[in-house]
Amino acid sequence: MSSALPDVSVTDLTHSLSPLQWVGMQGIDLPVRIEEPTYQRELHARADVQVDLPAPHVKGIHMSRLYCLLDAWGQAAAVSPASLFALLQEMIDSHQDCGSRNARLRLDFDLLVRRPALVTEGLSGWKSYSVHVLATKVGGALNLSIEVRIGYSSTCPCSAALSRQLIEDGFLRTFKDQPLLEASAVAQWLRSNASLATPHSQRSEARVRVTVPSDAPDLGLLALIDQVEGALRTPVQTAVKRADEQAFAALNGQNLMFVEDAARRIQASLRGYRDSQVHVRHLESLHPHDASAWSAPQASAPDQQESFATGNER
């Protein structure tokens, strides 16, 4: 019995002599460490790793090599631009016999962050943010982008104005024959009738993608999330009591916004980031469809905006 195991990727020649842009694996389970100034945690991620296969005579790549490199990287290093780019180079170096010159890595994970209640001291809860990291080395050029998804509440300005008009009409009908009003009477009427009409609001989602500088010490995930939530001012909450719910209602009333307003707010907050792209979606409670808006500093790249807008990625 022969001790040598067959390797058809080496011994079998391909019948179609054509290069392949990317070959590799998707959805590899992996623990990753995120280490940022205000956040340190090990998380469960799913990874995609690929290299190019430019040599048409080579039947296939060595997927086990990519897997082992990824596995060792996940155990040894925190996720950072430096560690990601080092892994990409190792992936390319491991496939010199395939002529590989390019590599890419994608990580998908949820960043779990503890958030305090708006008002109640000592009350907090966990909030999850979906994160996508894409690192590439193509033609010698390194590129790293991060994408985060952030939930927030949006209240329609038009609906708020229509609601205020109905409340105003109700007030005038009630007090039209009373030229002098006591504050207590007005307050009592408002307690019973201020919700005569209410504006529609809904849970909404922002997707934000930015390029991370290659010399950055970390990905800056929490800093980006905090920046966007600060611009929107109505991020969805975790643990709440009545005082927190009231404070949240006040924030929504003070920050009425169309989907266009939300996209512009976020884009304005990203001026310090390179190549930022924004997609916001309001899951309308008035309609069975969503309202959406997209924003990017350079509107001259519609192909990139379209790929970002499809939302078909895992």
Curated annotation (Swiss-Prot):
Q: Which protein, by its recorded name, is this?
A: GTP cyclohydrolase FolE2
Q: Name one Pfam family in it.
A: GCHY-1
What domain of life does the UniProt record list for this protein's source?
A: Bacteria
According to UniProt, residues marked as the site described as May be catalytically important are: 156
One GO term under biological process is: tetrahydrofolate biosynthetic process
Q: Which family does it belong to?
A: Belongs to the GTP cyclohydrolase IV family.
The alphabetical list of record keywords is:
Hydrolase
Give the organism the record lists: Pseudomonas putida (strain ATCC 700007 / DSM 6899 / JCM 31910 / BCRC 17059 / LMG 24140 / F1)
Give the function comment from the record: Converts GTP to 7,8-dihydroneopterin triphosphate.
Keyword Transmembrane helix listed? The answer is no
State which pathway it belongs to: Cofactor biosynthesis; 7,8-dihydroneopterin triphosphate biosynthesis; 7,8-dihydroneopterin triphosphate from GTP: step 1/1
What EC number is given for this enzyme? 3.5.4.16
> What GO molecular-function term can you cite, just one?
GTP cyclohydrolase I activity
